[in-house]
Amino acid sequence: MPKPSVGINGFGRIGRLVLRAAVEKDSVNVVAVNDPFISIDYMVYLFQYDSTHGRFKGTVAHEGDYLLVAKEGKSQHKIKVYNSRDPAEIQWGASGADYVVESTGVFTTIEKANAHLKGGAKKVIISAPSADAPMFVVGVNHEKYDHANDHIISNASCTTNCLAPLAKVINDNFGIIEGLMTTVHAVTATQKTVDGPSGKLWRDGRGAGQNIIPASTGAAKAVGKVIPELNGKLTGMAFRVPTPDVSVVDLTARLEKPASLDDIKKVIKAAADGPMKGILAYTEDQVVSTDFVSDTNSSIFDAGASISLNPHFVKLVSWYDNEFGYSNRVVDLISYIATKA
């Protein structure tokens, strides 16, 4: 089977890291990129140099209106570059892009993302939560994808991708009565470097580098969409903290069946070594956030940081590289849906 041909709309943090993940995994072929705000020579620079994940360990250049990305031992990607503001005008079909990653953060509904289909794309994967597109978390509910009807789908959020695999393992083994999630979350591009206006969410406009900022997140409620039996049982919030990358989920849950912390560790380790390998990982090391920069897993359970009050009430801690782990799942989701074409 030929590799799926992919287009990327929006060459920001996620767009660029999806391309890095595509090069590394060598499982999809990126054939087009669109970004109205970045010239092709600037794309080369932004892709080559990354303050968080380091310099790209390969070659990147441009020839005419094509980006040329290569890495030793991997396939070369010859990528047509577009600079269109209107997604309906991007000629995805002409460049052969069947699957479009919508990573601008702007076109996150079925109606808005549908514009990509007009340019010849067959499927759109939104790299953000969506109000109405079906959400899939690889390793949790990706097998519910329906090729005949699901043309615009969401890869959910980075936090949902961390929480859902953990919640699935716990719920499958012990049952979750209810739970509260907190994510201690790295800064993202929407935050301000210094205090500034921020619409209705005044706290969000405070300086990202000097504050711990309480914020809302739909990530926990979204788990109820990908694991229907947990619908209405989870909610959560976020603290934005002054670190550039890597976040951590704290899930505090009440369990139906009694379980010791050792019982919980055993089932998570079994899932991490077995059916969820590459999605969920397990560590007993004395780790901190920077140890997970560029980690490709969705969720890394921290056995040493997790605690139990009693056999029915536990606090479970799981790390995630909110940029790179997530970008790898975008590529995995495309690889999976391509097998259903």
Swiss-Prot record:
Kindly list the residues the record flags as site (Activates thiol group during catalysis): H185
Q: Where on the tree of life does the source sit, at the highest rank?
A: Eukaryota
Which positions bind D-glyceraldehyde 3-phosphate?
S157, C158, T159, T188, T217, G218, R240
Q: What is its main location?
A: cytoplasm
One function term, GO molecular function aspect: NADP binding
Q: Where in the cell is it found?
A: Cytoplasm
Q: In which pathway does it act?
A: Carbohydrate degradation; glycolysis; pyruvate from D-glyceraldehyde 3-phosphate: step 1/5
Which keywords does this chain's UniProt record carry? Cytoplasm, Glycolysis, NAD, Oxidoreductase
An example of a Gene Ontology cellular component annotation for this protein is:
cytosol
Oligomeric state and partners? Homotetramer.
In terms of PANTHER family, this protein maps to: GLYCERALDEHYDE 3-PHOSPHATE DEHYDROGENASE, GLYCERALDEHYDE-3-PHOSPHATE DEHYDROGENASE-RELATED
Family the entry assigns: Belongs to the glyceraldehyde-3-phosphate dehydrogenase family.
Q: What else is known?
A: There are four nearly identical glyceraldehyde 3-phosphate dehydrogenases in Caenorhabditis elegans.
Please identify the protein, giving its name as recorded: Glyceraldehyde-3-phosphate dehydrogenase 2
